[in-house]
C-alpha cells in the first residue's frame, strides 16, 4: 500500500518535456513546484506493459538505486506509484552521454581518458563492494555531469545483487560490450563489468568498440574468441601503459582479468593529475550525512504535505528470458506515447502515490533477464522472440555454431518487422568502412556503431537479440539514463 495515498507526484513536480522513451517507460523533464530552478528526470513506467515479473525488475532497479550514494552514479530521490504508473524521481543530467561526446568532439587524449576512466572505475568499485553487478556499461549509459569531465553511470535496469560464490547465468546486456563468458553461455560474475570498462577505454581512444562488425554473427564470434587488435594507424598516439591496461581488461579468462581495485592501482590510472581529478570531484560532491541521503525533493514542502518512499518488496523470480515480439513492442510503444501525452496535457487530474514496502533478499540462484530499457535508439528498445520460450534447457551446450545460427535467424526474421520512430534528418551518415581514413585527430564513431548496442538475452544454447534490420540506427532524443 502507498505510504501516503493522498499525495501525487503532481503535487510536487511540474512535468514539462519528454526527453527519452523506451520499451516500458518514458522519461520526462520536471521541475519542483516550490523551487522552479530545480530540475529532475521523472522516469514514468506504465503498468499497462508490466506483468508481475517485469514489475520485479522495476523493484530491483529501485532497490539498488536507493542504496547508491556516489558522485559518479546517477542520484535517485524517491518514487511514487498509482494504479497506472510507477514514477522514479532521478537526477537530471543535461550534458549528454559519452557516445554523443565522442561523436561531436572526437576521441579523447590520454589525460581526458584517464579522468573519465578513474571516475567510471570509482563508480564500479562502489557497486562491486556492494555486491552489485551493472551488466550494461556502455557509452550511452555514461553521462556527463559537467563540462570538466565528471561522469555519472546510469541505467540500472539490468543491475543486480549477486553472490560471488554462485554467480549469474542468464546473459543480458549489449553485445558489443559483452564479455566472452556471456556469449559462451557460462556462469559469470562481476568481472563482466571490467570487460565492459576495457571496451569503454578502447572506445574513447579509438572511436569504436574493440569488437565491431557490420555482420552481427561475425561480431558475436569475435567476442566469443576474444579476437581484437589496436588500429594500426592510431595506436602509436597512445602510451604503452594505457594499451597495457586495455589488454589486461580485455583478458578472455575472467579469472585473470583485472578487478576494479587492480585497475585503479594500475600505473596508467595512478599517473593521473590529482589536481584535475579533484576539480572534477568537486563538481559532483558526494552526499555524506545520513539526513541528506534520505532527504527527497518532496521533503522541501511542509511536513503536512511530505511524502516518504522506501524500497519495495523484492520477490524471488524463476529463471526468465523476458522476450517480447515485435508486434507487442509496437503496441506498447504506441500505448506509452498516448499515455504520456495524456499526462502532459492534464498532469494534475490524476493522483500517484508513494510506494512503500520492505526490501527482502532475492534468491541469488534465480536469475532474470531485464528488458526494462529506455534507450534513444530503437534497436535497444525491443527484443524479438522467434523461438518458443519453453525450449528445452540444454544447459551443457556451448556449441558456438548453433549460437551463431540462432543469432542470424533472429536477425533475418526481425528485418521484416523493423520499426523506426526517429526522424530521418537525425541520421549520421558515415560509412564504417571509411573509419580508418578519417583524420587521426578527428576520428569519430559512425552512427552505425549504435547498431552494436543491442540488448541481448542468452539462455543456455539459445541466442535472442534485438536487431534493427538497418545497420544505420537513427538517433533519437537524449535519454538521461
Swiss-Prot record:
Enzyme kind, highest EC tier: transferase
The keyword Nucleotide-binding belongs to this UniProt entry's keyword annotation: yes
Stated regulation of activity: Does not have a calmodulin-binding domain.
A biological-process GO annotation: protein phosphorylation
Top-level division of the source organism's lineage: Eukaryota
Entry annotation: catalytic residues: 136 (proton acceptor)
Coiled coil spans: none
Domain spans labelled Protein kinase: 13-269
SMART domains: S_TKc
Annotated Low complexity bias: 379-421
Keywords of this entry: ATP-binding, Kinase, Nucleotide-binding, Serine/threonine-protein kinase, Transferase
Family stated for the protein in its record: Belongs to the protein kinase superfamily. CAMK Ser/Thr protein kinase family. CaMK subfamily.
Function summary: May phosphorylate a specific serine in the N-terminus of a myosin light chain.
PANTHER family attached to this UniProt entry: SERINE/THREONINE-PROTEIN KINASE IAL-RELATED (PTHR24350)
Protein name from the UniProt record: Probable myosin light chain kinase DDB_G0284661
Amino acid at each position: 500500500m502507498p505510504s501516503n495515498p493522498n499525495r501525487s507526484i503532481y503535487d510536487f513536480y511540474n512535468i514539462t518535456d519528454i526527453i527519452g522513451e523506451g520499451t516500458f517507460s518514458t522519461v520526462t523533464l520536471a521541475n519542483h513546484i516550490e523551487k522552479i530552478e530545480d530540475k529532475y528526470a521523472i522516469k514514468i513506467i506504465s503498468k499497462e506493459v508490466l506483468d508481475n515479473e517485469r514489475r520485479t525488475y522495476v523493484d530491483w532497479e529501485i532497490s539498488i538505486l536507493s542504496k547508491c550514494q556516489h558522485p559518479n552514479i546517477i542520484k535517485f530521490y524517491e518514487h511514487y506509484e498509482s494504479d497506472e504508473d510507477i514514477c522514479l524521481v532521478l537526477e537530471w543530467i543535461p550534458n549528454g552521454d559519452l557516445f554523443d561526446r565522442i561523436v561531436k568532439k572526437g576521441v579523447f587524449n590520454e589525460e581526458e581518458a584517464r579522468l573519465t576512466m578513474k571516475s567510471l572505475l570509482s563508480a564500479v568499485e562502489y557497486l562491486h563492494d556492494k555486491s552489485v553487478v551493472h551488466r550494461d556499461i556502455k557509452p550511452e549509459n555514461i553521462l556527463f555531469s559537467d563540462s570538466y569531465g565528471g561522469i555519472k553511470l546510469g541505467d540500472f535496469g539490468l543491475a543486480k545483487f549477486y553472490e560471488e560464490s554462485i554467480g549469474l547465468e542468464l546473459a543480458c546486456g549489449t553485445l558489443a560490450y559483452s564479455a566472452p563468458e556471456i556469449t559462451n553461455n557460462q556462469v559469470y560474475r562481476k568481472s563482466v563489468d571490467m570487460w565492459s570498462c576495457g571496451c569503454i577505454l578502447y572506445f574513447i581512444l579509438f572511436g569504436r568498440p574493440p569488437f565491431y562488425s557490420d555482420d552481427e554473427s561475425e561480431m558475436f564470434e569475435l567476442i566469443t574468441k576474444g579476437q581484437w587488435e589496436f588500429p594500426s594507424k592510431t595506436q602509436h598516439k597512445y602510451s604503452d601503459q594505457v594499451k597495457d591496461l586495455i589488454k589486461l581488461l580485455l583478458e578472455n579468462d575472467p579469472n585473470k582479468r583485472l578487478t576494479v581495485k587492480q585497475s585503479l592501482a594500475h600505473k596508467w590510472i595512478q599517473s593521473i593529475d590529482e589536481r584535475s581529478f579533484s576539480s572534477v570531484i568537486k563538481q559532483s560532491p558526494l552526499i555524506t550525512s545520513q539526513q541528506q541521503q534520505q532527504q527527497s525533493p518532496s521533503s522541501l514542502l511542509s511536513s503536512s504535505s511530505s511524502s516518504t518512499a522506501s524500497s519495495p518488496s523484492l520477490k524471488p523470480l524463476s529463471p526468465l528470458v523476458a522476450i517480447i515480439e515485435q508486434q507487442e513492442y509496437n503496441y506498447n510503444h504506441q500505448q506509452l506515447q498516448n499515455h504520456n501525452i495524456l499526462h502532459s496535457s492534464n498532469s494534475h487530474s490524476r493522483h500517484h502515490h508513494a510506494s512503500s514496502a520492505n526490501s527482502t533478499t532475492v534468491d541469488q540462484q534465480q536469475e532474470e533477464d531485464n528488458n526494462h530499457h529506455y534507450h534513444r535508439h530503437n534497436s535497444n528498445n525491443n527484443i524479438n522472440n522467434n523461438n518458443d520460450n519453453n525450449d528445452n534447457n540444454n544447459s551443457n551446450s556451448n556449441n558456438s555454431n548453433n549460437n551463431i545460427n540462432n543469432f542470424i535467424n533472429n536477425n533475418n526474421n526481425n528485418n521484416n518487422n523493423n520499426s523506426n520512430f526517429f526522424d530521418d534528418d537525425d541520421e549520421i551518415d558515415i560509412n564504417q568502412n571509411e573509419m580508418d581514413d578519417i583524420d587521426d585527430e578527428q576520428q569519430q564513431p559512425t552512427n552505425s556503431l549504435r547498431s552494436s548496442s543491442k540488448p541481448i538475452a542468452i539462455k543456455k544454447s539459445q541466442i535472442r537479440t534485438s536487431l534493427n534490420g538497418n545497420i544505420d540506427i537513427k538517433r533519437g532524443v537524449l535519454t538521461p539514463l
